[in-house]
Structures are given as C-alpha cells and as structure tokens.
C-alpha cells in the first residue's frame, strides 16, 4: 500500500504533499486506504474525514482539489513522485512557460486564466479573435483578462480573412453538412486556431489552451489545427482535466481566486456568433420535439412579421465567388454583412436540425444564416448555367466529403486542400449574376445570366432549330435503352 504525508519545509516554502510508495519507509506518513477500483478518482479529495468509502486521510493537507486528485493517482501508481503545492513552483501537471488562451471574456475562460497559472505555473496570454461576432462582445475584454490574471490580451481582426479564405471556399464548394448545416462554427474554429499559433510564435509561448468541453466538436477543430500548423506546441484543455462541473462551481472558483464574475444575466441558450451565422443550443432545444421560442432569434425576424412586399436583389459572381451586390463591388466581409441585414429583415436563413456530432452523439441546434442562405442560392443557381451535368454531379459528390472534413476540423488536411483546387478549377467559368426575390423567409431565384452560359435558347426552344434535329433522338434512344431492351427480352424467353 502507498502512503501520503503532509509536512512542512523550512524557510518560505508552503505546505507540500509528499508521495512515496510504502516500501520507501524513510518518511513517517499517514496511511491511506487505497480503493480497489479507480473509477471514482474524480470524486476523491484529500480531507480529514473518510471520503465516500474510498480513502481515509489524517493530517492537514493543502492544495487545490485537482492537485489532490493527481496526488491520489500518484499514490495508486506507487511511483514515488514528490509533488508540492508551492504557488511559486509548477502545478502538479508540470510547468509550462507561457500559454496562449482562446479568450471570450465569459465566466469559463476567465476562470481558466488562474487555473492555468495554478496548475501549470505559467504566464497566460489571452487571445481574442474578431470574426464578426459584434462590437459588444469585445468591449472591456482587456480589463477582464488582466483582472483574471493574464499578462496581456491580444485582439486580432480576422473578419476579412475569415470570409475570404474560409467561408468563400466552402461556399464555392457547396459544402453543406447533413443537408442543412452551413458550417458556421466549423469554419470559424480553424481561422481562430491558426491565429493562436501565430500569436504563440509572436509572444514566445510554448503552449495553447481552449475552453471547449469534452463533449463537443470544437475541441477537435482547435487541436487538429494546432497539430497541423505547429506540432511542437503543447495543448491544454481544462474542461477535460479540472473538477469544475458547471456554472456554480466556476463561480465558486472565481470568487476564491478574486476573478471578477460577469454580472450579466446568464443566457439559457448556448450561443456561438460570427459574421456568417448565429447558433442556438441548450435549454428547451435539447428536446427535439419542442418548438423554438420566437424571442430566441437575434439575426432574423419571424417570417410572419417580415415585410409584406418582396425585395429583389442581384448578386454578382466571378469564378464561383460573390463580388457585388446590386451592381456595387464590395469586399467579402462587407458583402456578407449587407446580406445579413437584408436577409434578416425578411426572415431568411433559419435552420432547425438534429445533427450527428463528430464525437458520436446527436445534438439539436437552431441556426440563423441569412446572408449565407442567400449566397448559397445565388452561387448554385449560376452553376446551373455554367456547368455541364457530369461536372455538377462530381462537384456535388465531393461537396459532401468537403463538408464532412470541415465539420470534423480537418481544414488543413491535404485532402481538403486538394478538393479546394478542384473546386477552384471547375468553377472558373461560373461568372455572371443572379437575381433573387426575398419574401417572408423564402429565397426565390427570378433570373440568372452569364457570358459563359451553356444554355442556348435556339437549341432548347420548342420552336424549329437548325442546330438540333429532333429525328436524331431516335437513334440515341435506341442505343441508350439497349441494355433495358435486352434484359426484357431475356425475361420473356425464360
């Protein structure tokens, strides 16, 4: 049996946990009853009293609960490791020099700052990406970050890069996950993670950290990007390590560490917003039978309350990418922002779906993507003029795999990059304009034109044509239907 002792060291050192296997015997230790099962480690905590029948510890022991749990693991392994809780030293998980944390300013990421310092003995640099989530989300972040213990806050405007280099390639590819989801969160994570890698290099950090839970997709999206762009960086995911189980635990931890707790009312929904979309999850949405409340939506009006008069708009497209609105050339981010306003006014782009998460479970989400819904309708419609049947079929097939890879966080995978090269080539003639009618939640195409159109009115017309001889169809039909005819003949003989 292994043992733990709580002792004190001279000078300025604080109390420490000293762990030795029982055969060592050089220290006088208090006995610990080691449980036969290891399934309840997270429920253990070094206290004076008996802990749910798993261990009995006497003597004063200091340190965070996470440190104590780690101590118990070391006891069970009997590896003779000595671990201290001196705040000047590294935490029980080992020392890191400097960590770049993806920071939102909310309760969770604010609590992560002191947790990283306590458990890894590191300096924390907070990073916030502006991907079009709104100016209110960015207000007061530097003050919050430093009050939580961060050495600095780095903010970068990634909006144009996000739209140009991440959203528009997915739009050109026609990438839609499970027939509905336009990949709003999936596309945002790699651009944020990429910027974190850049910031880590700029500030000399040896690690990055995120606040994603162990149940979601985002942890994968962040970490696959880190692996792809700098495999030397260490990755810390507190939600997979700490004992904080929810909001109340986080608030208690924040108070103990003098972290200012946000006083804003906690939303009953879990939301993610960027320039492309706004997602809603949680609360009554967790039951797929429940209808979303009208006051949940933030980017779009209820279609029933939308204007009674339709609005017509024209989208200009070059080589498969939108470049203009109503004849006016706009930057990618500006164009999308304009369409969000117009589409939201008409109740465009609401999606309610149950999707298969990458980690195996199903989840229900409601998404608002007004501008994106309009752009998908425009680009796909113009392709109907400029692409032949085989090209459309192959492109649509690859679009499914493309969407799957983006959803799974494999943005920097060579396969996605190779498919992107195909999409760029196949859409190089997709240039022209599309006119759409927006009315009470619907997007209807009313016109399309392209200098590269494969549509020929003189051929397709029911009127007489010198190019297309209708008599030619007879031979084509005989050859095209020959296998079916032979099969029918065999059935008749048998």
Curated annotation (Swiss-Prot):
ATP binds at residues 102-110, 129, 211. InterPro entries: Arginosuc_syn_C (IPR048268), Arginosuc_syn_N (IPR048267), Arginosuc_synth (IPR001518), Arginosuc_synth_CS (IPR018223), Arginosuc_synth_type_1_subfam (IPR023434), AS_cat/multimer_dom_body (IPR024074), Rossmann-like_a/b/a_fold (IPR014729). Pfam families: Arginosuc_syn_C, Arginosuc_synth. L-citrulline binds at residues 181, 186, 217, 221, 270, 279, 355, 367. Its EC number is 6.3.4.5. Keywords: Acetylation, Amino-acid biosynthesis, Arginine biosynthesis, ATP-binding, Chloroplast, Ligase, Nucleotide-binding, Plastid, Transit peptide. Disulfide bonds: none annotated. It is found in: Plastid, Chloroplast. GO terms for cellular component: chloroplast; chloroplast stroma; plastid. GO terms for biological process: L-arginine biosynthetic process. L-aspartate binds at residues 213, 217-218. Pathway: Amino-acid biosynthesis; L-arginine biosynthesis; L-arginine from L-ornithine and carbamoyl phosphate: step 2/3. Its main location: plastid. GO terms for molecular function: argininosuccinate synthase activity; ATP binding. The modification N-acetylalanine is found at residue 74. It catalyses: L-citrulline + L-aspartate + ATP = 2-(N(omega)-L-arginino)succinate + AMP + diphosphate + H(+). Residues 1-73 form a transit peptide. The keyword Cell membrane does not apply. Homotetramer. NCBIfam families: argG (TIGR00032), PRK00509.1 (NF001770). Belongs to the argininosuccinate synthase family. Type 1 subfamily. This is Argininosuccinate synthase, chloroplastic.
């Amino acid at each position: 049996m292994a043992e733990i002792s709580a002792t004190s060291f001279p000078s300025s050192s604080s109390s420490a946990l000293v762990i030795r296997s029982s055969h060592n015997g050089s220290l006088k230790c208090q006995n610990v009853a080691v449980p036969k099962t290891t399934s309840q480690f997270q429920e253990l905590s070094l206290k004076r009293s008996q802990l749910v029948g798993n261990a009995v510890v006497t003597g004063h022991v200091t340190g965070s609960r996470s440190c104590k749990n780690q101590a118990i693991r070391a006891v069970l392994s009997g590896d003779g490791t000595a671990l201290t809780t001196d705040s000047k030293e590294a935490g029980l998980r080992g020392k890191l020099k400097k960590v770049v944390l993806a920071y939102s300013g909310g309760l969770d990421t604010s609590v992560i700052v002191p947790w990283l310092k306590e458990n890894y003995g590191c300096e924390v640099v907070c990073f916030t990406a502006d991907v079009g989530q709104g100016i209110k989300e960015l207000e007061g972040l530097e003050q919050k970050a430093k009050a939580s213990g961060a050495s600095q806050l780095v903010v970068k405007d990634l909006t144009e890069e996000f739209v140009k280099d991440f959203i528009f390639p997915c739009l050109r590819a026609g990438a839609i996950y499970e027939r509905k989801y336009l990949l709003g969160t999936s596309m945002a994570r790699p651009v944020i993670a990429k910027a974190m890698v850049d910031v880590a290099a700029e500030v000399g950090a040896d690690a990055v950290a995120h606040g994603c839970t162990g149940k979601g997709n985002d942890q994968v999206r962040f970490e696959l990007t880190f692996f792809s762009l700098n495999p030397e960086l260490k990755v810390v995911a507190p939600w997979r390590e700490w004992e904080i189980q929810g909001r109340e635990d986080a608030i208690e931890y924040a108070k103990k560490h003098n972290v200012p707790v946000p006083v804003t009312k906690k939303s009953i929904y879990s939301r993610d917003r960027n320039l492309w979309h706004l997602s809603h999850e949680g609360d009554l949405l967790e039951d797929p039978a429940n209808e979303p409340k009208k006051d949940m939506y933030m980017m779009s009006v209820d279609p029933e309350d939308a204007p009674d008069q339709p609005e017509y708009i024209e989208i200009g497209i070059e080589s498969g990418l939108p470049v203009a609105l109503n004849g006016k050339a706009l930057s990618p981010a500006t164009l999308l922002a304009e369409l969000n306003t117009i589409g939201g006014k008409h109740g465009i782009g609401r999606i309610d779906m149950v999707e298969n998460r990458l980690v195996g479970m199903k989840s229900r989400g409601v998404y608002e993507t007004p501008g994106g819904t309009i752009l998908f309708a425009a680009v796909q419609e113009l392709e109907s003029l400029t692409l032949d049947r085989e090209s459309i079929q192959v492109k649509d097939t690859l679009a499914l795999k493309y969407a799957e890879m983006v959803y799974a966080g494999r943005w920097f995978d060579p396969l996605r990059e190779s498919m992107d090269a195909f999409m760029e080539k196949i859409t190089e003639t997709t240039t022209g304009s599309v006119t759409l009618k927006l009315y009470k939640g619907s997007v209807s195409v009313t016109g399309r034109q392209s200098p590269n159109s494969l549509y020929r009115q003189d051929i397709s017309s029911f009127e007489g044509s010198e190019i297309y001889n209708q008599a030619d169809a007879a031979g084509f039909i005989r050859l095209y239907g020959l296998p079916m005819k032979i099969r029918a003949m065999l059935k008749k003989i048998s």
